[in-house]
Amino acid sequence: MQPPPRKVKVTQELKNIQVEQMTKLQAKHQAECDLLEDMRTFSQKKAAIEREYAQGMQKLASQYLKRDWPGVKADDRNDYRSMYPVWKSFLEGTMQVAQSRMNICENYKNFISEPARTVRSLKEQQLKRCVDQLTKIQTELQETVKDLAKGKKKYFETEQMAHAVREKADIEAKSKLSLFQSRISLQKASVKLKARRSECNSKATHARNDYLLTLAAANAHQDRYYQTDLVNIMKALDGNVYDHLKDYLIAFSRTELETCQAVQNTFQFLLENSSKVVRDYNLQLFLQENAVFHKPQPFQFQPCDSDTSRQLESETGTTEEHSLNKEARKWATRVAREHKNIVHQQRVLNDLECHGAAVSEQSRAELEQKIDEARENIRKAEIIKLKAEARLDLLKQIGVSVDTWLKSAMNQVMEELENERWARPPAVTSNGTLHSLNADTEREEGEEFEDNMDVFDDSSSSPSGTLRNYPLTCKVVYSYKASQPDELTIEEHEVLEVIEDGDMEDWVKARNKVGQVGYVPEKYLQFPTSNSLLSMLQSLAALDSRSHTSSNSTEAELVSGSLNGDASVCFVKALYDYEGQTDDELSFPEGAIIRILNKENQDDDGFWEGEFNGRIGVFPSVLVEELSASENGDTPWMREIQISPSPKPHASLPPLPLYDQPPSSPYPSPDKRSSLYFPRSPSANEKSLHAESPGFSQASRHTPETSYGKLRPVRAAPPPPTQNHRRPAEKIEDVEITLV
């Protein structure tokens, strides 16, 4: 740990600043004098050479032409967008009109050489006067700052003394009367102490007032120094040197133009084309001459001598196929994650740039550092995303279903970003500090899923055109055999629980009595009407009469592990069903509680390692959400679950076998608005933990084909069979039941 920086006195800091100001002004003055001297000597030499007629002029120009300038070639000598050809053409034109310079030697002496010497002499004198005046002004400011330091010191001493007297008086007032002390003596001491405290308070107040007045005067003096005195000194030091320099530069070209028509044509052409010098063209020439900056050839695949393949290969039904699918899923997840990182960092960058003016001077450097870090993070995320997209393009070329994984991952990320946008509080500026700038930065370090609990609720939009409140119970009218992995086989007269709509019309997602979930044709089902509630309750009562007689051992282990295990154990909840594509991947249903073993790996592919039902494996992190500290078993209701007896079902009206979450987990699913987090009361937990009836067995935990995480069907639903296939005698009326 480094020691804290040493505090520098205000007076010493002011002296250092003033010394640096003086040094910079002298350096600026010296540079201007050097430029005047260069112009003066150049005019003298040129006039002397003109006296010697053409020989002397050619000698002068040849001295400058001998220098090798980069970017000057024979084929681009007439391209005046480059600065070096312009300067070279100027020297060549000088040599061409050498004989005409004899008549203008006096003009150089009268208009440039002598005035430049006079201007430089005056500038040296002005520098001496300005330095003396600036030194005097700086000394006055130093004296003001010294008075401020004295007033501050006196204020601190008197205030500390007054504080000590006040503390002593408070202690004496709270002390009890001793056996050997009389009340009169205590009163005298109290009066004396109060007088002392009043005197110290008066001195402290006087010192504070003097300090504040001195502070105001010092600030005013400092403002005067920077806004008036320093500006006037710099203006006096510059004088009219820039006007003289401008006149000298004009005199060089004007004198040459007035010599003769040939000279006029030459320098008029140079004058017009000198303004065409641009940085982009000079940079282009530089890149053309230096091949080291050119883009090299793409890297080529170098096969082994015995290998004849030159591209990715996929064999159906082999491990390679699963490996390529895993790579597609891995890099699609990475693309989505980096897209989210770019959006977050761009949001941080916009906040920093928009609120930069409100930041105080002390934190300006920190603000610039944060802006640079945000831009660097965006650049890195764009590179990672570009590399991942290149991998996906190559996988797509050989037929891997890249679009499926990419669409699924991007939909998830876009829903999270939309939810974050609505849940994101506005930026608040207070005391020059932006309190909302760190929120988006911290979000990149740990993805926040707490605001995304309502993202997956699709019940508000029904593709079929009918608004329904899911889940609801319906009856199968026609039998249907699943033809796709994400579909569900149903039998006639079977009772299903419809949980949500599909993306395409005439498809809905349903769960059967054994807990299997999949898509079924909507027209194959009979949805409940507004009557026959009693018959529906009677037909469904038997399915749930035994739901409160058994408990789940996995739930008991989870609660016990949360209470008795390590406090650092982290749990996550599955947002979708997932089936592992390889042996080392973990399979789990929606709502499952998974214990996290490791969040970091060497590939950084978005996969975490966890344990579920005694099995250890890896799984995509975008399919789960982290549970908060209260949900990991640190709240009292988790302890009450173990000791509270299960309530017996009411004899008159048994509960309906409708579930707000998959039977594989005792906790509510995040895509149901009726429950966001774990239950908050013991009674609510008991109902949730014992809501699983024997009719909905645990055998459906590993049914990945019907997972929520896969894409919804985009195929057309099959038409229902003819009406003769249905037996009208067995028509059953259903009723829509919404759980609260």
From Swiss-Prot:
It comes from the Eukaryota. Transmembrane segments: none annotated. GO terms for molecular function: phosphatidylinositol-3,4,5-trisphosphate binding; phosphatidylinositol-3,4-bisphosphate binding. SUPFAM superfamilies: BAR/IMD domain-like (SSF103657), SH3-domain (SSF50044). One of its GO terms (cellular component) is stereocilium shaft. Phosphorylated. Phosphorylation on a Ser residue is important for recruitment to the cell membrane and for its role in promoting endocytosis. InterPro entries: AH/BAR_dom_sf, F_BAR, FCH_dom, FCHSD2_F-BAR_dom, FCHSD2_SH3_2, FCHSD_SH3_1, SH3-like_dom_sf, SH3_domain. Pfam families: FCH, SH3_1, SH3_9. Liver, brain, heart, placenta, skeletal muscle, pancreas, lung and kidney. It is found in: Cytoplasm; Cell junction; Membrane, Clathrin-coated pit; Cell membrane. Residues 567-629 are annotated as: Required and sufficient for location at clathrin-coated pits. Residues 307-323 have a biased composition (Basic and acidic residues). Residues 356-397 form a coiled coil. It is a peripheral membrane protein. PROSITE patterns: F_BAR, SH3. Adapter protein that plays a role in endocytosis via clathrin-coated pits. Contributes to the internalization of cell surface receptors, such as integrin ITGB1 and transferrin receptor. Promotes endocytosis of EGFR in cancer cells, and thereby contributes to the down-regulation of EGFR signaling. Recruited to clathrin-coated pits during a mid-to-late stage of assembly, where it is required for normal progress from U-shaped intermediate stage pits to terminal, omega-shaped pits. Binds to membranes enriched in phosphatidylinositol 3,4-bisphosphate or phosphatidylinositol 3,4,5-trisphosphate. This is F-BAR and double SH3 domains protein 2. The lineage of its organism: Eukaryota, Metazoa, Chordata, Craniata, Vertebrata.
